[in-house]
Each structure stands twice: as structure tokens, then as C-alpha cells.
């Protein structure tokens, strides 16, 4: 699994973190000051990269969490069939099928950018 461990205090809005075994993009990050009996706490709110579900995480700032290493890749649309597109990776020349997001209109020979993590892929931009 391409991921690494970081302390919660090292996270920032816009970066990625694993929540409930799913990679999520951090939308909001806040900390509460340490009290008389305990350390500072951080609250992280994020949205699933591939499933769009909202998730939250509350941990001490010195706790360790997993951070996924999500790759941003380039591809070319080979063919379009309904809601699916046949895409060829421009680095490895591997072809695979991807779901076309609503509102997007792809044609053959379009270059696209997509995110990939553990076999899951999503078109961005």
C-alpha cells in the first residue's frame, strides 16, 4: 500500500489522509488548546476522494495517522461508450475503463488528468 505515517499536527487543508480506510481530502482542520489534564486535540474533516463521503477524525495532535500517496497521472481517451471511457495511460500505455463524471463530455483523443490509488481511478479537472 502506498502510504506513509505522519503526526496529526503535520496535516493541512488540501492534503490527503486515511479516514475509515478510505483516502480523503482534508476540507477543514482545527485544533483545541491543551487543557489542564491532557494534550491538544485536532479535528479533521474531509471528503472521500473516490466515494465523495464526508468523514471526520478527532485525535491528539501527536497521534500518528496514515497518509495515502495518491498519484496524479495523464491519460488519453481512446473511445467513449455511454458513461464509460476507454483510457490509455500516457506513461505505461496501459488501457483501462473509467466512469465519466457527470457534466464532463469526452471524445476520442482527449487528454485527461486522473488520480490513482490502489487500483481506484478518478478523473480530475
Curated annotation (Swiss-Prot):
Membrane-spanning segments: none
Hypusine modifications at: 36
Compartments where located: Cytoplasm
Gene Ontology CC: one annotated term: cytoplasm
Keyword annotations of the record: Cytoplasm, Hypusine, Initiation factor, Protein biosynthesis
GO biological process, one term: positive regulation of translational elongation
First-listed, main subcellular location of the protein, grouped into a coarse class: cytoplasm
Keyword Protein biosynthesis: yes
Name of protein: Translation initiation factor 5A
Natural source organism: Halorubrum lacusprofundi (strain ATCC 49239 / DSM 5036 / JCM 8891 / ACAM 34)
Gene: eIF5A
